[in-house]
Amino acid sequence: MQGNLSAWLVKHALIHRSLGFDYQGIETLQIKPGDWHSIAVILYVYGYNYLRSQCAYDVAPGGLLASVYHLTRIEYGVDQPEEVCIKVFAPRKDPRIPSVFWVWKSVDFQERESYDMLGISYDNHPRLKRILMPESWIGWPLRKDYIAPNFYEIQDAH
């Protein structure tokens, strides 16, 4: 079964994969990293101009990393929003996904957090650097294969 957006993407020959619907009836689509930026621009023009959230997670130890975007389209009024969830998977060895900062500015800190915690590099992000961990931190703390150091020192703020 396809949702409205998935049918529209098929009609316009935009490559994606439907991953089904969640309990609220929101469709989840998988987009390849190489197609993500152009599809993001198309979605914005189509009316998905509100990025509700962006997050990332480690799918499995040694497996893929996923960047997840929740988008909303409010066309017929605030009480009837159309929502979609986009998942972009990246290989663990060199996880690179195009940044959508230039499409939705609100993704700034969220992509930085995903970089800081999981090591996903968002290409063309204007300030991609650590946001929660010290710049000297080694590794990506939310990866399932991350080994926490036995000792670390956090310096006092001066």
From Swiss-Prot:
<keyword id="KW-0520">NAD</keyword>
<keyword id="KW-0793">Thylakoid</keyword>
<dbReference type="InterPro" id="IPR020396">
    <property type="entry name" value="NADH_UbQ_OxRdtase_CS"/>
</dbReference>
<dbReference type="GO" id="GO:0048038">
    <property type="term" value="F:quinone binding"/>
</dbReference>
<dbReference type="InterPro" id="IPR001268">
    <property type="entry name" value="NADH_UbQ_OxRdtase_30kDa_su"/>
</dbReference>
<comment type="similarity">
    <text>Belongs to the complex I 30 kDa subunit family.</text>
</comment>
<comment type="function">
    <text>NDH shuttles electrons from NAD(P)H:plastoquinone, via FMN and iron-sulfur (Fe-S) centers, to quinones in the photosynthetic chain and possibly in a chloroplast respiratory chain. The immediate electron acceptor for the enzyme in this species is believed to be plastoquinone. Couples the redox reaction to proton translocation, and thus conserves the redox energy in a proton gradient.</text>
</comment>
<keyword id="KW-0521">NADP</keyword>
<keyword id="KW-0618">Plastoquinone</keyword>
<dbReference type="GO" id="GO:0008137">
    <property type="term" value="F:NADH dehydrogenase (ubiquinone) activity"/>
</dbReference>
<keyword id="KW-0472">Membrane</keyword>
<dbReference type="GO" id="GO:0009535">
    <property type="term" value="C:chloroplast thylakoid membrane"/>
</dbReference>
<protein>
    <recommendedName>
        <fullName>NAD(P)H-quinone oxidoreductase subunit J, chloroplastic</fullName>
        <ecNumber>7.1.1.-</ecNumber>
    </recommendedName>
</protein>
<keyword id="KW-0813">Transport</keyword>
<dbReference type="Pfam" id="PF00329">
    <property type="entry name" value="Complex1_30kDa"/>
</dbReference>
<keyword id="KW-0934">Plastid</keyword>
<comment type="subunit">
    <text>NDH is composed of at least 16 different subunits, 5 of which are encoded in the nucleus.</text>
</comment>
<keyword id="KW-0150">Chloroplast</keyword>
<dbReference type="InterPro" id="IPR010218">
    <property type="entry name" value="NADH_DH_suC"/>
</dbReference>
<dbReference type="GO" id="GO:0019684">
    <property type="term" value="P:photosynthesis, light reaction"/>
</dbReference>
<keyword id="KW-0874">Quinone</keyword>
<keyword id="KW-1278">Translocase</keyword>
<dbReference type="InterPro" id="IPR037232">
    <property type="entry name" value="NADH_quin_OxRdtase_su_C/D-like"/>
</dbReference>
